[in-house]
Amino acid sequence: MNVITETEYKEENINENTLVNIQEEYKKTKIQEVLNQLDKELIGLTPVKNRIKEIAALLLIDKLRIKLNLPQANPGLHMSFTGSPGTGKTTVATKMADILYLLGYIRKGHLLTVTRDDLVGQYIGHTAPKTKEVLKRAMGGVLFIDEAYYLYKPDNERDYGSEAIEILLQVMENQRNDLVVILAGYKDKMERFYQSNPGLSSRITNHVDFPDYTAEELLEIGIMMLEEQQYQLTEEGKKVLLEYIKRRMTQPHFANARSIRNAIDRARMRQANRIFNSSNRVLTKKDLVTIEAEDILKSSLFMDK
């Protein structure tokens, strides 16, 4: 049996006994570095991380098949990310763009995030130029369309979203070797969107569902957010923040990690106000970096109870 090195992938060197060191090939792609970053940046989401690893493994194997002159399945790369706001969809999309670039499936590796407003015009003849300009900027990378279902408004005959969808469909089919599209949004709304637009559904081969975070995971996220800004939460503060999270999860417009970031920002503001009002004493570094339980307890969520 002969082991093929990187410079020896020539047809005359390949036979059914050719060996490929998959770990060596995997290491050369540097994909593991991206996956490690994903683990570091996102708490939990194990099903999502496993799905991304599966997609990466399939793409790597397809690349090796090409090198060994085996038929390529021509994997569909367009994706659907479904889940509530604040569950890490944009972060994962960024890492997915990195993986696709490292494996050579896209030229540039950039991620362009857009919504309906970036694609759909307000009058006749306005939508096509807007959509085409966005697609031009996205070429060679990944186009991430958040809340994609807002492109389709069947109850409004004068809506131009369908025009944007038609242009998008053409590009997803005809230029799929130079652009990957990720459609994202709430799961139930995305399912209805696909039912109403079977052309889009047929072009999406990778579906990734993002579960909501647990209260404990959101506490970890909150602590991590504070540590990134060089703040510390007291032990009592951690207990209060967990209680805040449990209450906030039952309130309207809860957005997972996004809501926690907002809560952290407000706690920092209350901490600053508390410190300012006690400015008749000399402050220490510990004073400046410590978030106390009272900085969270002053939230209206506790005042109403």
Curated annotation (Swiss-Prot):
The keyword Manganese does not apply. GO terms for cellular component: chloroplast. It is found in: Plastid, Chloroplast. GO terms for molecular function: ATP binding; ATP hydrolysis activity. Gene3D superfamilies: 1.10.8.60, P-loop containing nucleotide triphosphate hydrolases (3.40.50.300). The keyword Plastid applies. Keywords: ATP-binding, Chloroplast, Nucleotide-binding, Plastid. ATP binds at G83, S84, P85, G86, T87, G88, K89, T90. Necessary for the expression of RuBisCO. Belongs to the CbxX/CfxQ family. This is Protein CfxQ homolog. The lineage of its organism: Eukaryota, Rhodophyta, Bangiophyceae, Galdieriales, Galdieriaceae. The gene is cfxQ.
